[in-house]
């Protein structure tokens, strides 16, 4: 058993998470009471009898580690008792699905103090309220409370603060969560290698996607963090391209297209990987694509080197733009001085998105405090604002794209068109887009890159050859 697997053989640290959330509530002036959370409900697709694909509610999982639907939990803050409630046995369900997890098995599996049936929720809540002389608060998330759940005896039911406290608490991961994210990355790296190898015989984007997903499932990750992006040729200029169904053969030239951008990550026990790579379809990058790849890789490596506890994320993002500007100046795509191009935000035409986002149980994880109303186009789509704490995990995903819809308004703007050399630019449209994305754990001493998928030009070309 590897050290990673030995860590994950222990229970998910739900009790520690409950305590941290309680501390977050106390920091806001709320003392004592009870936290109540519900799992995702079993639901059917609206027009047939098949279930909606199950995705556990993240607040519930964070305080339970439990993937069972139709469950709930109560954390008594004052007595430090965490109780999990699981559905009673339904004989009709047993006919089709077999016996569910028993209370004894659940107590053995999860980091909780008690396991009861969901029929005991209201009585348990009432007992907690009575033990505080009916002078305490129940904390819950309004849109995640079943109609039959009652908070009798509590002097207040607060639906306003719990969700935000959990989301802020989730930013800083413990060692178990880092192990889950590392496992998701390890599986995803295998998927990316398989996808690149599959491209050699593939004739359509969907075959590359299939190789990635199949490898993830075979290695223990049945779910994807998000729908994979597999974009060949100029499709790579679309940031969240989702079709994944275009032929790899150009119908005009009858030749294979130049390159593929794949953005894909496995989800392992609710924790997400988010990795992007670009690779050639013909074994070697074209000169123009190689030049752009070198710039993007330099953007990423320099930004990763800046990462440590307390670094201002906006500064790292701005540095990525400066590296992009220098590279595009060297190629002759941009004209002018670095400072003028930066101040005029010309690089936004080629790098329109944020450098990265928090990562955890959600791909775009909680706590980033973005400002999508920012009038500064360089920072509008930056999903994390502020200083990075130790224990956070963030993606570093610079990119350069040749998207006509984004670039042409700059070319038509009388004040901005002079900064872009159209003649040189025309040689690069076929590149589409290059993005390189890793998942990085911020530590007190610096950082730890969780992503092992190959990314040097030599590594990628060797796999694609």
Swiss-Prot record:
Pfam families: AMP_N (PF05195), Peptidase_M24 (PF00557)
Manner of cofactor binding, per the entry note: Binds 2 manganese ions per subunit.
The protein's required cofactors: Mn(2+)
Catalytic activity of the protein: Release of any N-terminal amino acid, including proline, that is linked to proline, even from a dipeptide or tripeptide
Described function: Catalyzes the removal of a penultimate prolyl residue from the N-termini of peptides.
Similarity section: Belongs to the peptidase M24B family.
Annotated protein name in UniProt: Probable Xaa-Pro aminopeptidase pepP
Classification lineage: Eukaryota, Fungi, Dikarya, Ascomycota, Pezizomycotina
Gene: pepP
């Amino acid at each position: 058993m590897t050290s990673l697997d030995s860590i994950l053989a222990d229970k998910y640290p739900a009790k520690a998470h409950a305590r941290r959330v309680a501390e977050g509530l106390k920091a806001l002036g709320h003392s004592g009471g009870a936290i109540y959370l519900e799992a995702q409900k079993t639901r059917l697709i609206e027009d047939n009898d098949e279930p909606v694909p199950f995705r556990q509610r993240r607040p519930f999982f964070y305080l339970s580690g439990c993937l069972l639907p139709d469950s709930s939990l109560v954390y008594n803050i004052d007595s430090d008792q965490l109780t999990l409630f699981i559905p009673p046995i339904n004989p009709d369900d047993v006919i089709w699905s077999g016996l569910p997890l028993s209370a004894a098995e659940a107590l053995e599996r999860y980091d909780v103090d008690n396991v009861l049936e969901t029929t005991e929720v209201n009585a348990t809540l009432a007992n907690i309220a009575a033990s505080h002389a009916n002078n305490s608060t129940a904390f819950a998330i309004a849109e995640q409370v079943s109609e039959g759940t009652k908070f009798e005896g509590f002097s207040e039911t607060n639906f306003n603060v719990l969700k935000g406290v959990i989301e802020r608490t989730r930013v800083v991961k413990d060692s178990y969560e880092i192990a889950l994210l590392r496992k998701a990355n390890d599986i995803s790296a295998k998927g990316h290698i398989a996808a690149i190898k599959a491209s050699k015989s593939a004739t359509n984007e969907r075959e590359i996607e299939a190789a990635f997903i199949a490898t993830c499932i075979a290695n223990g990750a049945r779910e994807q963090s998000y729908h994979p992006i597999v974009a060949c040729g100029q499709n790579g200029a679309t940031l969240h391209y989702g079709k994944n169904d275009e032929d790899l053969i150009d119908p005009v030239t009858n030749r294979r297209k130049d390159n593929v951008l794949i953005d894909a990550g496995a989800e392992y026990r609710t924790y997400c990987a988010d990795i992007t790579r670009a690779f050639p379809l013909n074994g070697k990058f074209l000169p123009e694509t190689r030049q752009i790849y070198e710039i993007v890789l330099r953007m990423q490596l320099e930004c990763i080197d800046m990462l440590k506890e307390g670094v201002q994320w906006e500064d790292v993002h701005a540095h990525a733009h400066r590296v992009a500007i220098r590279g595009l100046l060297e190629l002759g795509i941009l004209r002018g001085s670095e400072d003028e191009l930066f101040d005029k935000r010309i690089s936004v035409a080629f790098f329109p998105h944020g450098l990265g986002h928090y990562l955890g149980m959600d791909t775009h994880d909680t706590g980033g405090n973005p400002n999508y109303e920012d009038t500064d186009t360089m920072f509008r789509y930056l999903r994390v604002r502020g200083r990075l704490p130790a224990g956070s995990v963030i993606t570093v995903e610079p990119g350069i794209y040749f998207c006509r819809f984004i670039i042409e308004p700059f070319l038509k703007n009388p004040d901005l068109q002079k900064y872009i050399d159209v003649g040189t630019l025309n040689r690069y449209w076929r590149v589409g887009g290059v993005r390189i994305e890793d998942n990085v754990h911020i530590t007190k001493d610096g950082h730890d890159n969780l992503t092992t998928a190959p990314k040097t030009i030599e590594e990628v070309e060797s796999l694609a050859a």
